[in-house]
Amino acid sequence: PSLAATLENAGVTDSRPRTLTILVSESDSFKVSIADYLSRTLSGGALTIKVRALPWNDYLTALQNGNFDLYLGEVRLTADWDISPLVRTGGALNYGGYADEQCDTLLDTFLQSESEETARTLYRYLDQSAPIAPIAFRTSSVLTPSGLIDGLTPTASSPFYGLANWAVHFDKG
């Protein structure tokens, strides 16, 4: 359905306008710019989106207390891509209080088997009901043939961390 139809189904009409606020940390000017863009893009008709940029600690407090309509954040997933902290009932990063028993069951099933089928089932379900909307994705990876490099210690922010300590075995590549 269109945005207008979705808003009308939610009771947002010209006679019942709604203002929502996007919470964002003011410490990241890029994220504030994104929030401003989303505000301008999504506002219209009966819907107004405002931006509330807060200092980092106030931002975290507002998230933890649920004092927001929408928020712009960043999550770095663990190596196993477990999204439980975001979408599991009571998850550490589930600031919106999303609770869905079927989602929890699908997460458990996926984490126990990690098959392509359970992943597809989980992601199809989340595509229809997820309380989050990913707007960007980035990965930092180092892929090498087994045994090519000794001493490889990449970090999330620096895939080439400790490069001076690497031993490259060209005969194994």
Q: PLM features: residue spans?
A:
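Short helices/loops that flank or line small-molecule/ion binding pockets
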Residues: 33-45, 57-68
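Structural motif
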Residues: 24-27, 74-76, 138-139
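Long beta-strand-rich cores associated with HINT superfamily self-processing modules
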Residues: 145-173
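Append "and occasionally in soluble cytosolic enzymes with long acidic Gly/Pro-rich linkers
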Residues: 1-40, 121, 171-172
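Beta->alpha turn/N-cap motifs
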Residues: 56, 73-78
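Paired acidic/hydrophobic, glycine-rich loop segments that form the ligand-binding mouth/hinge
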Residues: 69-74, 134
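Extracytoplasmic/peripheral linker and loop segments enriched in polar/acidic and small residues
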Residues: 48-59, 84-148, 172-173
